[in-house]
Amino acid sequence: MEFVGRYEQDVMNAVGLRGTVSVRELAALLDVSDQTVRRIVRPMVERGEVRKVHGAITAVTGAPTVGEAPFLSRMSEQRDAKVAIASKVAELVHDGDSLVLDTGSTTGYVAQALRGHRGLTVVTNSSFIATTLATIPGNRVLMAGVELRTHDGASFDHFAFEVVRRMKVRVAVLSASAIDPSRGPMVHEHAEAEMSAAMGEIADVRVLAVDATKFGRSALVALPPLRAGDLVVTDRRVRANVRPARLVVASGP
């Protein structure tokens, strides 16, 4: 059935993230019944894309999953913290909202947490985030860019920047590789810093989603300075000065 095929990419996303996902978790994620989940995965199992074990769906060793190993590796690091952060960020977003999300493991979890929302307009340069949210009824997802990086499926070509700079959204959800004590948020690549700056400029509210292990670290390229009205969402209280932004601590999962 057509509706079954519509959910297959969502199943692959979830399995790619976690390796094994229970039928009950998939039912909650897709907002369908357990029986419907079994109908969705049956042809996927027959094609060898996933394996069915007792009460769960698991990745097939050697089968293609979402993204390359570096991205999946980052998704597995500090997973509980990132899930908690994502849940808190999702509380800041309303049905019908407009937002932009950059590429990153934490923003990938934010996209998963936003699957319960409806009517979102989403701009992103991440193919993972785009496919996660594009199949939700009422959502409008704009994928910025044409050429995708191999290790995370993100785009930083001039088309990506052109799309982003033409938009206006309410919320920007951004990530960082480090929060340097003196220089603030930082990333490892110039293109990532430029994209973060472009996304921040088109939003009324900027939300920086970073787990607590990023504080006190440094990276190569500084992001735009934090400003009044910005929110820094993390998983536990840290001794760090994020002023003039406001620190928001998510409760644990």
PLM regions: where:
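Conserved phosphate- and dinucleotide-binding cores of soluble alpha/beta proteins
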Residues: 2-13, 17-24, 31-33, 46, ...
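HTH-adjacent hinge/linker in prokaryotic transcriptional regulators
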Residues: 2-100, 111-116, 134-138
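Glycine- and other small-residue-rich loops at beta-strand/loop junctions that grip anionic moieties
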Residues: 78, 99, 122, 153, ...
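A general structural motif
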Residues: 96, 117-119, 203, 229
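Glycine-rich N-terminal segment of FAD-binding domains in flavoprotein oxidoreductases
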Residues: 103-105
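A glycine- and small-aliphatic-rich helix-loop capping segment at beta-alpha/alpha-beta transitions
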Residues: 115-120, 190-191
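Short, compositionally biased
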Residues: 119-122, 247
